[in-house]
Amino acid sequence: MATTNSSAAPVIDARKTSILARFAPTSNVTTEQYDETIRRLEKSGDWLPEGLEYHVAFKSDGKFRVSEIWDSREQFDAFGERLMPVLKDVGIEPGKPEMLEIHNIIKR
């Protein structure tokens, strides 16, 4: 994966394959459920998890969505084991995430 910013040449780390995880929950998630999930993760010390580079939460077509960039699939999976009980407890059915290998990230 190459990482580019406007003031330097691309930095390429062939050892690292970042991933994009896109969630479209199967249940109708409210902002209150989302905020409660983050609050519980912070309280337990599980937020921000190692390997999470970006977390973006938004609504699209009236449905709550989350997209994340992770350093590795292994870190994503490890956090998922801690996250799933919290989601279940607050009533969120996350569905199966779409997982995509990242080719490039460009930052300003």
PLM feature spans:
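Short S/T/G/P-rich N-terminal loop/turn motif that feeds into the first structured element of a domain
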Residues: 1-67, 71-85, 93-108
